[in-house]
């Protein structure tokens, strides 16, 4: 598992996985590469992309460009953790993300750690079960994060004030 950091216009890019693809043709083997990349602004925006090319740098560049185009917003609590515990599943990849107190750090493995770092999460506990396939783990993590509701969103649904929702939080 390779990780690569690159700072540019406030967006952090992390290379999560590179895979070599072999196509057998009449004259022999043709090699290609696929790259899985996560990008984020470390303040609640994140994008994930997968791209293929004949050379590794081209695959990474394509994936970065695609990920920048599909940025989504994830609400963060105090800019450091998630609002509540969430569960996500994609294929055989299952993930449980739990909010953590200040100073805990990112307790997560591999691809989930990369997602948390580019998203700007500083305190979280994650447990991944099932597969260790980075594609499925990242998709499961994104599904879990998208299930999350902020107190502002819950307050609008219930027609209450944000302070009423937050004070009941345990």
Curated annotation (Swiss-Prot):
Annotated Gene Ontology cellular component terms: small ribosomal subunit
Any one biological process term the GO annotation gives: translation
SUPFAM superfamilies listed in its UniProt record: dsRNA-binding domain-like, Ribosomal protein S5 domain 2-like
Organism: Pelagibacter ubique (strain HTCC1062)
One Pfam family cited in the UniProt record for this chain: Ribosomal_S5_C
Function in brief: With S4 and S12 plays an important role in translational accuracy. Located at the back of the 30S subunit body where it stabilizes the conformation of the head with respect to the body.
Xref: InterPro entries: Ribosomal_Su5_D2-typ_SF (IPR020568), Ribosomal_uS5 (IPR000851), Ribosomal_uS5_bac-type (IPR005712), Ribosomal_uS5_C (IPR005324), Ribosomal_uS5_N (IPR013810), Ribosomal_uS5_N_CS (IPR018192), Ribsml_uS5_D2-typ_fold_subgr (IPR014721)
Subunit structure: Part of the 30S ribosomal subunit. Contacts proteins S4 and S8.
Name under which the protein is recorded: Small ribosomal subunit protein uS5
Taxonomic placement: Bacteria, Pseudomonadati, Pseudomonadota, Alphaproteobacteria, Candidatus Pelagibacterales
GO molecular function annotations of the record: rRNA binding; structural constituent of ribosome
Domain writeup: The N-terminal domain interacts with the head of the 30S subunit; the C-terminal domain interacts with the body and contacts protein S4. The interaction surface between S4 and S5 is involved in control of translational fidelity.
The entry's keywords: Ribonucleoprotein, Ribosomal protein, RNA-binding, rRNA-binding
PANTHER family named in the record: MITOCHONDRIAL RIBOSOMAL PROTEIN S5
Domain S5 DRBM: 11-74
Entry's family note: Belongs to the universal ribosomal protein uS5 family.
